[in-house]
Amino acid sequence: MKEGIHPNYREVVFQDMSNGFKFITRSTIQTRENIELDGKTYPLAKIEVSSESHSFYTGQQKIMDTAGRVEKFKNKFGVRASGKAK
């Protein structure tokens, strides 16, 4: 393998900006900011959504009312879609 062509794979802190949750994982992401955590300095990557804030993982999912949407569509376009003229 060639030397010097691979990105630096290191520990990085990812911070969820919606709730402040931080976790350390390994990544090759390039960052401009650093953060001190547990007495060590790590590169900081700010993210909008993580497993701590995503509705799928938190159990606060919104169930879409597809039946209501279909009824709304039929009420709006039902006459034209069925081929009947007024």
Swiss-Prot record:
Gene3D superfamilies documented for this protein: Ribosomal protein L31
One Pfam family in the UniProt entry: Ribosomal_L31
The keyword Ribosomal protein appears for this protein: yes
Keywords of this entry: Ribonucleoprotein, Ribosomal protein
Entry similarity comment: Belongs to the bacterial ribosomal protein bL31 family. Type B subfamily.
HAMAP family xref list: Ribosomal_bL31_2 (MF_00502)
Quaternary context: Part of the 50S ribosomal subunit.
Name of the featured protein: Large ribosomal subunit protein bL31B
